[in-house]
Amino acid sequence: MININDLIDENLIFLDLDLKTKSEVLETMADILYKEGKLINSEDEKVKDGFIKALWDREEAFSTAVGFSFGIPHGKCEFVKDACISYARLKNEIEWAEDEKVKYIFMIGVSAEQAGNQHLEILIKLSTSILDDDFRKKLKEAENKKETLEIIKEYASKERTS
């Protein structure tokens, strides 16, 4: 069973980013994972570009907007070292897909080797948290990275019975 707490830290959280497009979001958040050493061979820009391509491939197959102004873009590729999560809260909602706006983004990176169940577990835990009104309210009101991280860890580690 995957532990979300092991996949995210304060260096992977960004609040009130002033980004205007989905492209800016995907590139900026992928760059964060790249700079934080979450992708293999972090000196090679092609690695970051490969991860961004994996994100776009997923978006083109089906939008990763999940409602409540949340998006969960995710990429499975050989350029990801180990599963990781990055979170961004934007200053303003942006157009994510037709009739879908997003302000809160969880980006998931999973290595091609780990993709199967691990990838689905992460999506389920984040999606379940997003369905919780209190989780969304707390993330909206969080004042700093530390508080945001505590909220994410608290809700993602809850055992759900429903």
Per-range role (PLM):
Residues M1-S162:
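Cytosolic covalent-transfer regions centered on His/Cys nucleophiles
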